[in-house]
UniProtKB/Swiss-Prot annotation:
Residues holding Zn(2+): E187, H250, H267
The protein, known as: 3-dehydroquinate synthase
Reaction(s) catalysed (UniProt annotation): 7-phospho-2-dehydro-3-deoxy-D-arabino-heptonate = 3-dehydroquinate + phosphate
Family indicated by similarity: Belongs to the sugar phosphate cyclases superfamily. Dehydroquinate synthase family.
Cofactor binding note from Swiss-Prot or TrEMBL: Binds 1 divalent metal cation per subunit. Can use either Co(2+) or Zn(2+).
Species of origin: Geobacter sp. (strain M21)
Location(s), subcellular: Cytoplasm
Classification lineage: Bacteria, Pseudomonadati, Thermodesulfobacteriota, Desulfuromonadia, Geobacterales
Any one biological process term the GO annotation gives: amino acid biosynthetic process
Keyword terms, alphabetized: Amino-acid biosynthesis, Aromatic amino acid biosynthesis, Cobalt, Cytoplasm, Lyase, Metal-binding, NAD, Nucleotide-binding, Zinc
Gene name, Swiss-Prot/TrEMBL: aroB
The keyword Cell wall biogenesis/degradation belongs to this UniProt entry's keyword annotation: no
Residues that coordinate or bind NAD(+): 74-79, 108-112, 132-133, 145, 154, 172-175
Cofactors that this protein relies on: Co(2+); Zn(2+); NAD(+)
């Protein structure tokens, strides 16, 4: 079932997000519809490939494509240059040329790395996103950000490179472990908190249905998240302005991930912590009422996500924040929520004061 298509309007780089339930076996037809030819390298991981590679392979072969698998180890800890080289090795071994393309079958790590491989292999070949986690469906598969982590920071190496299409099948969420599923809900909260108050209301009212993985509620939540992000990306593809709002919760969230070596928290969990802290900072500066801050905290708690920063010395937090890609000469660009459904961007130069508000003192 195809529920709807959402257009990401970027002139000649525009593409559609196809949303549905049980539509994974349409991938071959979709690739033909967007004009792709040649060999398809399916980049996946050891968790997702056993579940969905055969469906993708059969669909692609029915559509007349040669298909080769490139299967990687699973986990954020593998989002690095060594694993990226494994993708290049697979592409070279399969003799992929510029007329070939990549299918990114998996979560955000696979999408980011496969997209970066597509952007850089032979100076660029097409790719299609097939996100299989809630987090990647509502965030990383939309907007063209690709890349890998560096030991000193998250996503420090990468490029903007748009896919030819995105295919989202919410039925793939049936096999997602509970913790991974909840992590994706954390990223969904972001869209309501700073960009759509009505969507935030929907999430509050439908939290139980979402937790039960109700298909209709999920399609609504995922499609609305994608539509909100698509609109922001269309306005600001390369994060020169308004797109920075999508980093709400990510500043401290990325610091948490860096300090814990990307092993203690899933991305959506770290973002949930970051959003709660951002709401506290927003309340401190008078941008957000206590009632709205408490609504954000309550929804995140109701969705089974963490809210408190892990304990590390303030100096370590400052060091992690100083490597944030949103740092400029005039300070750290911090996204605050203005009530619920709106935002403001602030340049914060006193990281010590910011951490004090969050309960991290010297």
């Amino acid at each position: 079932m195809i529920a709807e298509k959402i257009r990401v309007a970027l002139d000649e780089r525009s593409y559609d997000i196809e949303m549905g339930a049980g539509n994974l076996d349409r991938i071959g037809s979709l690739c033909r519809e967007v004009g792709l030819s040649g060999t398809a390298a399916v980049v996946s991981n050891t968790t997702v490939a056993p579940l969905y590679y055969e469906t993708v392979r059969l669909s692609m072969e029915r559509a007349g494509y040669r298909v080769v698998p490139v299967t990687l180890p699973d986990g954020e800890g593998y989002k690095n240059s060594a694993t990226l080289n494994l993708i290049y090795d697979g592409l070279v071994d399969a003799s992929l040329d510029r007329g070939s393309f990549i299918l990114a079958l998996g979560g955000g790590v696979i999408g980011d790395m496969a997209g970066f491989a597509a952007a850089s292999y032979l100076r660029g070949i097409p790719f299609v996103q097939i996100p299989t986690t809630l987090l990647s469906q509502v965030d990383s598969s939309v907007g063209g950000k690709t890349g890998i982590n560096h030991p000193r920071g998250k996503n420090l190496i990468g490029s903007f490179y748009q896919p030819k299409a995105v295919l989202i099948d919410v039925a793939t969420l049936d096999t997602l472990p509970e913790r991974e599923f909840l992590s994706g809900l954390g990223e969904i909260v972001k869209y309501g908190a700073v960009l759509d108050g009505g969507f935030f209301d929907f999430l509050e009212q439908n939290a139980k249905l979402l937790l039960a993985r109700d298909k209709e509620a999920l399609i609504q939540a995922v499609s609305r998240s994608c539509a909100i992000k698509a609109k922001v990306v269309a306005e600001d593809e390369r994060e020169g302005g308004v797109r920075a709002v999508l980093n709400f919760g990510h500043t401290l969230g990325h610091a948490v991930e860096t300090l814990t070596g990307y092993t203690r928290y899933l991305h959506g969990e770290a973002v949930a912590i970051g959003m709660v802290q951002a709401a506290r900072i927003s309340q401190h500066y008078g941008f957000c009422s206590q009632a709205d801050r408490e609504r954000i905290e309550a929804l995140i708690v109701a969705l089974g996500l963490p809210i408190e920063l892990p304990i590390f010395p303030a100096q370590q937090y400052r060091e992690a924040l100083s490597h944030d890609k949103k740092v400029r000469d005039k300070g750290l660009l911090f996204i605050c929520n203005q009530g619920i459904g709106a935002y403001r961007m602030e340049r914060l130069t006193d990281l010590g004061a910011l951490l004090e508000i969050c309960g991290i003192g010297e």
